Amino acid sequence: MAGNTIGQLFRVTTFGESHGLALGCIVDGVPPGIPLTEADLQHDLDRRRPGTSRYTTQRREPDQVKILSGVFEGVTTGTSIGLLIENTDQRSQDYSAIKDVFRPGHADYTYEQKYGLRDYRGGGRSSARETAMRVAAGAIAKKYLSEKFGIEIRGCLTQMGDIPLEIKDWSLVEQNPFFCPDPDKIDALDELMRALKKEGDSIGAKVTVVASGVPAGLGEPVFDRLDADIAHALMSINAVKGVEIGDGFDVVALRGSQNRDEITKDGFQSNHAGGIFGGISSGQQIIAHMALKPTSSITVPGRTINRFGEEVEMITKGRHDPCVGIRAVPIAEAMLAIVLMDHLLRQRAQNADVKTDIPRW
């Protein structure tokens, strides 16, 4: 199976399945001499891991990461960093009844069409369980970007179902189970989630991720535009069906005189473009949004077929998230960090000696 690696200079390759023995990844391109411990990675893993609230799947995985290589006496050596997380709470028996049935809205049908077989236990490689390793690798990138360049990456939920959320207080995001920045909407989210659990249904969500302190000049022309790579990275997250950079699809209703980010001697006067022009960072905040579909793993009966072509009624059993957007916040942060880390290393490799006299803000 190809497609397990992202990045050029900062490269992350993941492996493992939902109900396998373990998940792992290899991180290449980490500069030497960076202080790094397992505790540095664990914080974001704890934010993503299942079973931490009544609003997410009750699969209880400690997600304790192990650093297998690439770190000596507490600092990175410049060689490949191997990371491993053991799976400890698999319940494969929950899936034995559906081994011949294609769950609607899942990758069961497409995986079998592609490979001629599939690991039906929790979705195998297509499970969002894989994203634990992205978060671990992303934590390395976030640490480097923060300590060496002052770049801060943070994400939050900005919509659940038909409930829009305003970014009113970033400090609130880590104080509630929804990663919600809007204190006026937390009760409404709680009510919605309770109703969904009672109905056995699910709901979609929108997640916003913001990078501050990104220098101007990151990104490549044409095919490796910074916004293209960010969109690629975010679209690779399970259940993501749409990505916007800056104002995204809202620009359709704007005129050029409204949408252009005008510049004065004091800097940019707006940020409709999300901090990227011509595929290259402008030095403004980089802002991206992603839309996540409602999970198809619900107890509401639905129609599908089995591998013999027979129509059957499907009710998904097991432990699942009523809204996958909640735990997607640290995953989105990780993927943005991985892309920025890669482009920063590429910029340093090619254009380290470039100096300009034009203003920076």
UniProtKB/Swiss-Prot annotation:
Keywords: Amino-acid biosynthesis, Aromatic amino acid biosynthesis, FAD, Flavoprotein, FMN, Lyase, NADP. Its EC number is 4.2.3.5. It comes from the Bacteria. NADP(+) binds at residues 48, 54. GO terms for molecular function: chorismate synthase activity; FMN binding. InterPro entries: Chorismate_synth, Chorismate_synth_AroC_sf, Chorismate_synthase_CS. Pathway: Metabolic intermediate biosynthesis; chorismate biosynthesis; chorismate from D-erythrose 4-phosphate and phosphoenolpyruvate: step 7/7. Reduced FMN (FMNH(2)). GO terms for cellular component: cytosol. It catalyses: 5-O-(1-carboxyvinyl)-3-phosphoshikimate = chorismate + phosphate. Its cofactor is FMNH2. FMN binds at residues 125-127, 238-239, 278, 293-297, 319. This reaction introduces a second double bond into the aromatic ring system. Belongs to the chorismate synthase family. Homotetramer. This is Chorismate synthase.
